[in-house]
Amino acid sequence: MFIYGDNEQLKKELKKLVIDSGLTQKEVAEKMGVKPQQYNNIVNKENLAFRDVKRIAAACGYELQIDFVPAEQDE
């Protein structure tokens, strides 16, 4: 689990997820049903769609879970 900060952080987490899965980017693309160039276009977009994040996670054998928690309040 990680706390979302921004899209750059999310992209780094996705790259780590792919590495941890033991799959190559080409294999992830194949499991997603897209060409490797399309996969690169997806992960290099400025704003990732939740749908794309979910598809990448699933291709790597993971499930995307989203949880909302109360923000910490500064006193």
List the model feature ranges, each with a label:
Residues 57-70:
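C-terminal edge-of-domain segments
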